[in-house]
Amino acid sequence: MFKFASAVILCLVAASSTQAQHNPHWWGNRNTIVHLFEWKWSDIAAECENFLGPQGFAGVQVSPVNENIISPGRPWWERYQPISYKLTTRSGDEQEFGDMVRRCNDVGIRIYVDVLLNHMSGDFDGIALGTAGSETEPSTKSFPGVPYTAQDFHPSCEITDWNDRFQVQQCELVGLKDLDQSSDWVRSKLIEFLDHLIELGVAGFRVDAAKHMAADDLSYIYSSLSDLNIEHGFPHNARPFIFQEVIDHGHETVSRDEYNQLGAVTEFRFSEEIGNAFRGNNALKWLQSWGTGWGFLPSGQALTFVDNHDNQRDMGAVLNYKSPKQYKMATAFHLAYPYGISRVMSSFAFDDHDTAPPQDEQEKIISPEFDEEGGCVNGWICEHRWRQIYAMVGFKNAVRDTEISDWWDNGDNQISFCRGNKGFLAVNNNLYDLSQELQTCLPAGVYCDVISGSLVDGSCTGKSVTVDNNGYGYIHIGSDEFDGALALHVDAKI
């Protein structure tokens, strides 16, 4: 009986720990993550203090923090070819990283690190040099900066059949040397690396290529991690937030359902389907059942996004900054509809798949510069600084914990809905105007449309909508307007 009771207690503790790994540890009502892709640590620290904190963002996903191979031309993907766990990259060193984490935590912005647990660098002719000065010989699986040797890896093989679990989880993803996560030594080094980041104050991890690792191995690693550091404002016994890259289109041998109990999972179907809808390949009226009604993961297990650093570079349905009107409409819907753990993208301009981040003649990443309206220049796109996007971050904060109601559509590509009595969104993706008296569910008054303008000193710089005593307002979105959405909320009442 005692053994049975002990087993039950252990199971309950494990289940509680796993559920805790779905908690992103946001401040207050904040609830949007931004991926500042390839930014330097010092620039992220300043952005937390000067923009993200004041605009109500909740957290930042940062690029991989550990030493990587130096590749000719410095393509972005060199960050995904690690050679040690030393915290020196093109974004900065360990001291700069620690300073950034502290400064961001101090203003309520949590830091989530993109971590590479699946592999080390792929083949390189001869001895390769890393960003922290380490030398390595990937072709022989020699990584003395860790150290790893050939015995710490799975035998080399190529993934030719994506329906073969063995190949997916034990062969080399695009030639990257595949670590054996069942090895005690490998586990110890990965746990040591992640615990060091926790000590520095991070709130959690985006686990790259999670589907290429056995869920049981990841479960062991996650459960062995330290609690978050209370010196950075986390409560006692808080577990790191974990979201895992698992590409699952619904017919995969390795399924997202193997990982969603361990932490959140990147819901790639969300990205693909929202792109299809706002590209006009699927009527917006069908979005009324968005979320689990579309076969997506439960809301609290789904990390949602319009695009990410990988799929924004692919051809297909996925939207990116190069289709700005549709992209902003899709993002407005993403942040207004109550589904998922939301992440927005902040990109740099690219002409091909391998384009490096903005850099100088010495191949050092340059800091973003800003125009008079706060937008980025010099090669950085900074979608998170587009008013239409950061305003919807504020909208999402204002309507937190409310449900969707009063859905309206025209049977095609014009839609609107309320978020309780706190917010209202309308979208027009037709080639003709939306002009309609619609239920906004808001208290009577005049409201600033935060898509077309901002509330400044009690006045709206864009469109405004008068809401009557019954909650109705006249909504107009012209087909030729710069933006195809209109958003009102209680914190934007004039």
Curated annotation (Swiss-Prot):
The protein's Enzyme Commission number: 3.2.1.1
Cofactor(s) named in the record: Ca(2+); chloride
Enzyme class: hydrolase
Residues of the site described as Transition state stabilizer: D310
Signal peptide residues on this chain, from the entry's feature table: 1-20
Disulfide cysteine pairs (residue numbers): C48-C104, C157-C171, C376-C382, C418-C441, C448-C460
Recorded catalytic activity of this chain's protein: Endohydrolysis of (1->4)-alpha-D-glucosidic linkages in polysaccharides containing three or more (1->4)-alpha-linked D-glucose units
Quaternary structure, from the entry: Monomer.
PANTHER family assigned: ALPHA-AMYLASE
Protein's name in the database: Alpha-amylase-related protein
